[in-house]
Amino acid sequence: MNIYESDKLLAEYLLFHYGSAEEILPYEFGPRKALEYPARCVSENLTASGRALDLGCAVGRSAFELARTCFEVIGIDFSRRFIEAANALKTADLPYLRADEGDRTTPLIARVPAGIERTRVSFEVGDAMNLRADIGVFDVVLMANLIDRLSEPLRCLARLPDLVKPGGQLVITSPYTWLEDFTPRANWLCPALDGLRTALALDFDLVSTRDLPFLIREHARKFQWSVAQATVWIRR
């Protein structure tokens, strides 16, 4: 079974995307600058408007954030469970259970922030390495924490020149956690920034890089603290 179809990962990602600081990290200490990562992927990297694509959208928070300034946003993820949750959040709040300890849980509510025009966003199940031919072109493409979960990263990158309009923005964020569970070793881009530069050099200019910390809570006393590298590219 794909772990991204499991109840455990669905609940973790709903908390990661929509949980409050207190719901995720109820301690006085801890890496608070790592919270709100799906929103920061947009707010700290993009001056976005027009039509946007969120590849690997998970349960949708970044796609909704893009809708603050973009008139149309398409979110695509390979996980059917994630897309079902994102679509449910277009029209209603979504209850879920946060893992605390063992089988002890706390009921929480995932809620899209106020002020977002949710009708601008659509979600669909899809493969980032094999997108439908009629998806069109975009002013903004976001790929957050996706590249190291693809079996053929270069296949996905090769499609990007056809997806981003000239002058459009591409943002790729990733902690580059290469695992053979997802990507055959021969397909790892190591070092990743060099691999991205080589793959995108003919069509994109790299305009900035920055470090973006993020925090995923597994249970009350176990967290994944990671640092993604965000690269911003402009289509020639």
Where are these regions (language model features)?
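A short acidic, Gly/Pro-enriched loop at the edge of an enzyme's catalytic core
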Residues: M129-V141
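S-adenosyl-L-methionine
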Residues: T91-M129
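Conserved SAM/SAH-binding beta-strand->alpha-helix loop
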Residues: S79
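Conserved beta-strand signature within the Rossmann-like core of class I S-adenosyl-L-methionine
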Residues: G168-P175
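Conserved Class I S-adenosyl-L-methionine
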Residues: F182-D211
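Conserved alpha-helix/loop element of class I SAM-dependent methyltransferases that forms part
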Residues: G30-G50
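Conserved class I S-adenosyl-L-methionine
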Residues: S49-A58, I74
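A short glycine-rich, Lys/Arg-flanked "PGG" loop and its adjoining helix->strand segment in the class I
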Residues: L154-P166
